[in-house]
A protein has these predicted regions:
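Conserved N-terminal beta-strand and adjoining loop/helix that marks the start
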Residues: 1-2, 21-24, 72
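The catalytic Nudix box helix
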Residues: 17-51
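N-terminal strand-loop-strand
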Residues: 1-17
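Short aromatic/basic micro-patch
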Residues: 16, 70, 101
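C-terminal alpha-helix
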Residues: 122-130
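Active-site segment of metal-dependent pyrophosphate-handling enzymes
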Residues: 41-84
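NUDIX/MutT-family hydrolases
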Residues: 75, 86-120
Length: 132
C-alpha cells in the first residue's frame, strides 16, 4: 500500500505523494520521513532513495510576471511502522484535503504527476528485489 494525499485545493481524484521543503541542515532522507508524518499521520523508516524528479515551474503562476523556479524532489521508499492515516498535525492540515492508502500495484495509474508515477513503479520494483 502507498500513502497518498490530495493536496489542499486540488480536485477530488487528484492523488500525489507527500513531499515538502528541506529544513536548514536537514538531510533529504529525514525530510522525507518528516513530510510523510506531517502530511499523512503515518510514521516509518526509510528503505533507501528511489530517485529524483526535476522540473521547472513559474511562480507566481503568471508567466509574464513570475520567476522560473528549478526544483528537485527526492523520493524515498518508506516502510510504515506506526500512526493513523489522516491523523495530521494541526499546523499541516491546511496543506492536505484528504489522505488514503492506495494499492501500490495501482499507484502508477492513480497518481496525477508523471514523475511520481515513475517513483511508484520504482517502489514496486525495489520491493520485489527486497522480497517484501
Amino acid at each position: 500500500m502507498l500513502a497518498a494525499i490530495r493536496p489542499a485545493g486540488k480536485p477530488p481524484g487528484l492523488w500525489a505523494l507527500p513531499k515538502g521543503q528541506i529544513d536548514q541542515g536537514e538531510p533529504a532522507e529525514q525530510t522525507a520521513l518528516r513530510e510523510v508524518a506531517e502530511e499523512t499521520g503515518a510514521h516509518g523508516r526509510s528503505l533507501g532513495k528511489l530517485g529524483d524528479v526535476k522540473y521547472v515551474y513559474t511562480w507566481p503562476p503568471k508567466p509574464a510576471e513570475g520567476e522560473r523556479i528549478f526544483k528537485v524532489v527526492s523520493f524515498f521508499l518508506v516502510r510504515y511502522s506506526r500512526g493513523r492515516l489522516g491523523d495530521i498535525p494541526p499546523a499541516q492540515r491546511h496543506e492536505v484535503d484528504e489522505v488514503r492508502w492506495l494499492p501500490l500495484e495501482e499507484a502508477p495509474g492513480l497518481l496525477a504527476y508523471r514523475g511520481e508515477q515513475e517513483m511508484a513503479a520504482r517502489a514496486l520494483a525495489r520491493l520485489a528485489e527486497l522480497a517484501l
